[in-house]
Structures are given as C-alpha cells and as structure tokens.
C-alpha cells in the first residue's frame, strides 16, 4: 500500500510516462528524415547532378520507346490472326459470338433487322433513311417508330431490290463479268471521276472487240463494205448489251424489206463514237443519274414529304451544271472572219435559251391560237390525262404505293406518248381534227401527267372527248370504277370565267421559271410554284421529257428564222420606209411581216392556217451540212435559213460564220479591279485603295454634304437618276440584329436538322444557330437557304 502511493505520487509529479521518459537525454525522440517535408535536407544542386538527371530521363524514354516498338512489331508480324492460329481462332470465336448475339437480338426484335439492312445500303440510300429513322426514334413513340419501320422502311427496301433487278439485265451482268468492267454493277454509287475511268475501260473493251472482229472477217486486203458492216454489227451488239443504242442503228440495222440502200458512209462515225471514252462517259453518266434517281424513288425519297418531283441531289447537280455553263459563257466570246466579236453570255441570253424569251414566245403562240379559234368559231377544252397507278411510286401521303410495278419516269412518259399516238390515229380515221398545245409536268413523285389545251369544232367536242376518254382509261380499267376523274378529266373553257390563254398561262410559267407565281401554292406539294420551278426544270432535264408541244399549226422554227431575217434586212436597208417589202414575193413577204410583228395568229393564217399538212406551208426551215467535220469525222446538220416551194432557191439567215474563242484576260488588270478575288500570283492581293496608298497615289476624294445640300441634290435629280439611285439602294441589305434569334421547340430543331441533312448539309449546331439568328447558308447557283416562319426556305433574295 505504501509502494503504490509512492508510485502514484511520482507519476503525478513527473506528468506521466511520456514526460518522464523524455526527461532523460538518451531517451529524447529523434526527428524522422523526410526530404518531401523538409526541403532543407535536399542535397545541393550542381551541374553534374542535373546532367545525371537528364541522362536518367532519356534512358527511361528510350526504354519505353523500345518496349512500345517491340510490342508493335510483335503484334504486327507475329501476334495476329493471320499468323498465330491461336489468336485467329480466338478472333473467329469472338466474331461468331458477336454474330450469334446480334442474331438472337434480331430474332426477338425484327426492327433491328430492318435497321441493319438500311445500314448495309450505299450512302445515297442509307444516309437519308437513317436520318429519318433517327428522327422517328427521337419522338419517343415506340409503337409509331416500329410501325414506321415495318410499314414504310421494309417495303422500301423490298422495292429497291426489285428496281435493281430490273435495271441490271442478264446481258448487262455478262458485260460486267469482263476484266475491269466490274464497276458496271455499282454504277449508281459512282461519282464523276469513277464514271470517267469506267468509260475509258468500256471504250478499250469496244476497241478490242473491233480488233477481234477485223481479224476474223478481213481475210484479204480487198475488204468489201458488207464485211465492214458485219464488224460494225459485232461492236454494236456489245454496246446493246449495256442498254445503249449504237449511233445510226436504225439506218444500219438489217431489215427484211429495205427500200433504200445501206448508208455505209455512216459506219465510220458510228464506230468512232463507240470507241470514244468521252461518248461513253456521257452515256454512262446519264444512265447512272437515271438509275440513281429511280432507286431514290423506290425508297420514297422523291415525293412531297421529302423532295417533290426530283431528289435534292439532282437539283444540286442541275445548279452546279448551270453554274459551270454560266462560267463557260462568261469566259468565251464569238468572233467572225472580219474580227467582230460578240459576248457569248449576251448571245445566249438573247436566244430562246433564255427562260423569259421562251415563255413569252409560247404565250404569244397560245394567244394566236385563241384568236384563230374565235375567228373560226371553235371551242376550247382543257384535258388532264394521268398514268395508271402502277406507274406511281408513292401515294399522296408519302408512303409506298403497293401497286407500283417498278415503272420508271421515262416509261410513264412513253406510255402517254403511245396512248396519244393511238388516239390520234383513231381520231384521224374517224375524221376528227383538233389543234392546240400539250404540257407535260410531274406529279409529286415524278410520274408524268399531261395537260392539253385543245381547240376543235363545237360539233366534234363530244366525239373527241369520248374517244380520248376511251384511250385514257383502257388500261387497268377495273381500278377506276365509275369515277374516271383520277385518270381523265375534261373541262370546257367558259369565256365568262377566263380565256384559254389564262387557263394555260400558269402551267407554262410554273414549268419554266415560275414568273408571277410567287404567291401561288401548289395543291399537290404545298409549296410555292415559283420555288418548284427549279425542281421541275431539273426533272425534265434528268428524265429527258419534252415539256411543251404544239400540234396542228406551222412550225415555230420558221417563225424565228423569219424574225431573224427581218432584223437583218432592217439593219442593211437602214432608213427604209415603214411597211416596205423585204421579199419580192408578196405572199412570202406577208408571212415575214406577220412574224416580224410578233402576231402568231396572222403568221399561222398566212402560212396556210391550222390543220394544214406541213407540205402545204408557204415558208419552211432550210438545213445544210456543216462545212467542217466534227470530232468523229461526220458533217452534222445546221440551220441554213428559209425556203419556199413557191420561190426558187433558199434565203440564208446565217451567212456570217462565228467561232467560239476564249476571252483574253489581263492578269494585272484583273488583280487591280478585283482585289482579293483575282487569281493568286506573286503580287499583293490587297484591296485597290491599299494598293493605291502604298504606291504613293492619292486616295479618292469622297464628297460629303450636309442635309440641306443633300435635299437640294435629290430635288434636282432627273427621273432616270432617281431610278438608278433607287435600284442601288434596294441592293443594300439591311444589317441583321445581333440579338435576334428565333425560338423553336426541340422537335422543330430535330426536324430542321433532318431537313438540312436531306439537302446535303451537315445539320450541325453551328448551322442551325446561324439559321435561327437570321443568317443563311449558300446552296449553290446564287441561292441561299434561310429559316423563316418555322419553315426552311430557299431563294436568291432572302433578305428582301
């Protein structure tokens, strides 16, 4: 008890065991050595220590590089599935397992099969379809999404396979089996460069066929024309296997009852074309574009819900083609033997190639027919003829048409042409006659339908209408029932409601340039008729459809030549008396005067009237052979002028020979005028003002005036100067507000992104933000895309 008290007292006195232990010097705790916590313990730096550290780092990096290189070499040359059987077996097992898993998922979810099939298609098919599938998936409606895949996408893929089978025939596949011609099987997927290479290979194959035919047939030096024709037949047979009609095939082919001798002189130019790579490029590129367009029609990418009349790809290609043509016209000029020059762009714009001139001429012709009908007491009837449903690829709601038989746009046009030819033959046999104009235009899916403005005797109207209805509905009659309106629709024009010219004016304008139809909305597509004019023009160019055709009247080419002759005579005679005759024959001069005045009614009557055979017309177009041969050795036919059976000789309207040459451009002048837009050279492309300042010249003196002086200046301006100033002010685009931005929902944003992607843009967030802030994106040919009123629009005047 006493010891415990002493121990407790000692512990309380010394402050515990730790304090008691630290009281002795030999038991004092020592500080741990930690260079990270105590920088003072670091060894002093020296040049040697730094050099050693750098060497250590270099050695470490070199070791890592060697190890990496060793691993890459091992994996590339040894450890891969092609050399290591174990690795190859493991890779095969992995792929098989992945395929089984995907197959199992597709068995329980058939939608994945459809998506996989879409992804396996070429880019021009899969990209727009996947964008639409992505859009439907983003809506969050599972049943609607699955229904869209099953009811729309799967039938589209089935139709696509049928279209491909119809495009590639057995003979076409046989040609593709030759060495180097395998690309024929994927012709719709090629671009222009690939088609050019393929056309070179096809031309080489034709050359080898000709060499083989010559070796088999030409056994002696004395070659007969019939042997040359047999060699041509072999090369032509090879071309026919590619679905291409050889040149001069109708004149050179074998016929049982040939009335005229065989034109052997057509064989050399025909062979020259079939051995030319450029000729094959034009044929194959046309075939590629048509096949590609039909495939897009098969998957419902050409309709009013996607792209009306024709695909966006074809529209963009047409814009680019028009832009290149315009650049070509601007860079060339025409020159004659005397050295006179004409700007090629001005010549083209002054010709009938100008849409405005073409529209004005057709409207004047229709007006002339209207005046003649009033004079004769004829009635006017407006007919609409449509193809059967088997020619229509898409329904009105944008879904696949189950009755479509993979018929092409060209086949629908040929159907209407054949129907009209059969009707015309029956009409002439019945003693019925008519005259008028026919307009061919597309449905929203590209199928052709016709509008006819016909003038006839009132007593023949019912007979002609009944006969035309009989031929228009004779095929697939059971699908119409009692209502024949979807296939054939006649409408008697009431003069109280409008004239025949007013009926046809809209159809002529919307199929050329859409003049005056900016506010007219198409009932079929829901878009402005002026905006649809570009699609219609691209559709007619791609499918080679003749849009306008007049019948029962004299030719319009003679009308143009007479107007040209009248202008030439006015320039030669100078100050001649008004109404003075130009031609010696009064009857011919009367026809020329009517054409010069632009009165089609008088011109037609002076030519002999309507419903008169061509052999009885007074003035006709004269043709002649070209003086210089073409690149293929033949002399083409060109217009010489006019001729008449009641007068001797021909009248030449193209006496001056013009040649096409490239304009001479001064590079220094172009650089000084255009600044940074000039071609890249060693000179400085600064703006002209900066160049002037650097060269020591004086800056241009810009006159300023106060408000009173400005008012006086504007008050003293003439009417012409005011118009010019107003026109310049209209060209100034207003500044866009920086804070302006349209507010749209997420669904509208997704729809905008899908539309941009369908038109060939990226549809990125930056593009969408630019459009929402009031900006625009160039789409080619001077047009721009902008977003206004929650709708994507395209125009060349988007600011106005």
Swiss-Prot record:
GO biological process: DNA replication
InterPro entries hit by this protein: Replication_gene_A-like (IPR008766)
Active site: 503, 507
Keyword Transferase among record annotations: no
Keywords: DNA replication, Endonuclease, Hydrolase, Nuclease
Source domain of life: Bacteria
EC number in record: 3.1.-.-
Molecular function GO terms recorded: endonuclease activity
Function: Possible endonuclease which induces a single-strand cut and initiates DNA replication.
Similarity remark: Belongs to the phage GPA family.
Descriptive protein name: Probable replication endonuclease from prophage-like region
Source species: Salmonella paratyphi A (strain ATCC 9150 / SARB42)
